[in-house]
A protein has these predicted regions:
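Bacterial N-terminal signal peptides that target proteins for export
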Residues: 1-7
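Accessory carbohydrate-recognition regions in carbohydrate-active enzymes
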Residues: 24-413, 420
Length: 420
């Protein structure tokens, strides 16, 4: 009897959710209900980064390097921040990424090697949760060590940083090319200053994704001078390459310095095109507002009517996490890296996605999408079919066009059957 009553209540609630009127949704700010820090402690492996739904780029804070609870790069109990990288996973049991870490600095820029067991870079900053804020599409924290306020937001393929500096003749940034989440192997690292406001670079690393190729294009609002720091350090029987770009400039009190980063798995030209298409200007607040709008479009697909604010926060935070991945993997010109690790081109009406944790998501995420966004679910299935055509088999767990082989079964069957 109790079980039947509970099931009836759940079904009744579902009908209320799916029958909600769209006019009411547009008037409500559903991002207000999301707590981006839920899941960042314990073994949740989530992060408070500034993403848009299914974004290719995931800018956010990085607080730890190694161990199982470093999977997203951020752990709530940590008290220092290494910087802000542009790629990360959410809610997974495996780790990767943490690419192109940017850290604002004031004073000496330390680069010494602290060993692979250290969770901190020498330039890490202390921070407190009292001076930290996160909401869908936006992240902010005050870096106590440097007296700098950091803010992040993003579009699908590009991130914008805004840093408020104190007065200093020794302000700058460290772009840490060799930074990774967990102990990856950096096979190639290249970075160059195109001029005194533009950097571009490339990195190939091997870890869970056995070959990850990633390019970036970055533009800064303030001219800089730079020092390229490279080295090879010995630890036990390992030779570990080091590559960092140190940027230098002067700042006035409360001067804001902005940076725009875009990425591509195809080439630097792809990263450049992504930035030009999605972030041609410097309107940080406008980009943030657009990100909020995109999140409200997702979250408003289900309207929960309850006076219990805790239940509302739990629900919309879970829904927020559901729309973080799979991730867009197609540049604005339609090019992407296929499962054969060759460059392909697709019709932009049908972009290709990656990060398919199918063993996890076939149970609940994809059934949810058949209700709230069946067209997007169809696009995911279309991507998986292309991956079969390119690589010869369907992936179990596709990670940036790498067959990781993680987990068991062929879960694509379960998610494609309802669309037939």
């Amino acid at each position: 009897m109790k079980i039947n009553m509970l099931l009836s209540g759940c079904l009744l609630g579902l009908l209320c959710f799916t029958a909600c009127d769209s006019e009411g949704n547009e008037m409500n700010d559903y991002t207000h209900y999301v707590n981006s820090f839920i899941g960042t402690g314990g073994h949740g492996h989530t992060h408070p980064g500034a993403m848009v739904p299914h974004g290719m780029i995931q800018p956010g804070p990085d607080t730890r390097i190694d161990g199982w609870d470093s999977c997203s790069g951020y752990y709530y109990e940590d008290t220092t921040i290494n910087g802000f990288s542009h790629t990360r996973l959410s809610g997974t049991g495996c780790a990767d990424f943490g690419d192109f870490l940017l850290m604002p600095t004031v004073g000496e820029q330390r680069t010494e090697f602290l060993g692979t067991e250290s969770q901190k870079r020498p330039f890490a900053s202390a921070f407190s949760h009292e001076k930290e804020q996160a909401e869908p599409g936006y992240y902010s924290v005050f870096l106590d060590t440097y007296g700098v306020k950091a803010e992040l937001t993003s579009t699908e393929r590009a991130a914008m940083h805004r840093y408020t500096f104190p007065e200093s003749r020794e302000a700058g940034f460290i772009l840490d090319m060799d930074y990774n989440i967990q102990q990856q192997i950096n096979q190639v690292m290249e970075v160059e200053a195109v001029n005194d406001t533009v950097l571009r670079g490339y990195k190939r690393s091997a870890y869970w994704a056995y070959r990850q190729d990633l390019y970036f294009y970055a533009v800064f609002s303030k001219p800089f001078t730079y020092t390229l720091y490279t080295d090879t350090v010995q630890e036990n029987d390992k030779q570990i390459p080091v590559c960092k770009m140190l940027l230098h400039f002067e700042t006035a009190k409360d001067e804001q310095v902005l940076a725009k980063f875009s990425i591509s798995s195809v080439d630097a030209e792809g990263a450049y095109k992504n930035l030009q298409a999605e972030m041609p200007g410097w309107n940080f607040d406008g980009v943030r507002a657009d990100a909020k709008k995109k999140w409200n479009e997702c979250l408003s697909k289900i309207a929960v009517k309850t006076n219990n604010e805790d239940q509302r926060a739990i629900f919309y935070t879970a829904m927020y996490h559901a729309f973080l991945s799979p991730n867009l993997f197609t540049d604005v010109d339609g090019r992407y890296l296929g499962m054969d690790l060759k460059v392909h081109t697709t019709d932009m009406k049908h972009p290709v996605y990656t990060i398919f944790s199918l063993w996890d998501t076939f149970r609940a995420l994809h059934p949810l999408l058949t209700i709230v966004d069946p067209q997007l679910n169809t696009e995911f299935i279309r991507s998986l079919i292309k991956k079969h055509q390119e690589g010869g088999i369907f992936p179990k767990w596709d990670c940036v066009s790498n067959y990781t082989g993680t987990m068991v079964g062929l879960s694509l069957i379960h998610i494609s059957e309802p669309t037939r």
